[in-house]
Structure formats: C-alpha cells, structure tokens
Amino acid sequence: MASLKKSLFLVLFLGFVSVSICEEEKRQEDEDEHEEEGENQEEGSEEKRGLFSVLGSVAKHVVPRVVPVIAEHLG
C-alpha cells in the first residue's frame, strides 16, 4: 500500500509540474504575441505617417495647379 501511495504521489507531482510548465510557456507565448501586436501597431502607425507625408507633398504640388483650373471652369 505504501508503494502505491508513493507511486500515486509521484504521478500527481509530475502532473502538477508539467501543468505548471505548460502554463509558463502559454504565458510566455501570450506575452510574445502582445509584443508582436505592439510592434505591428507601431509599424502601422509608421506606415500611416509615411502615407500622410506622401499625400501632403502631393497636395502641395497639385493643389496650386488645380485650384486655378477649377476657378476658370466655375467662373
């Protein structure tokens, strides 16, 4: 009976250890995913800033030429 208790205790102990290791790995993966999401959001904001700067430079060159043409057609 004592050997059965020891075996059962060993199985339970190893089960708890493996569960705790799995939980740690899952937490680490979740943290890594959150970091990647943060990096992706930063990259997205950089892309948006790049897009707005391109649109701004296009607007600087196009608007002064388009406004007089529109004014001629309307007036």
Curated annotation (Swiss-Prot):
Subcellular location: Secreted; Target cell membrane
Chief place of localization: secreted
Pfam families cross-referenced by the UniProt entry: Caerin_1, FSAP_sig_propep
Tissues of expression: Expressed by the skin glands.
Propeptide: 23-49
Similarity comment: Belongs to the frog skin active peptide (FSAP) family. Caerin subfamily.
Protein name: Caerin 1.11
Organism: Ranoidea caerulea (Green tree frog)
The organism's taxonomic lineage, starting at the top: Eukaryota, Metazoa, Chordata, Craniata, Vertebrata
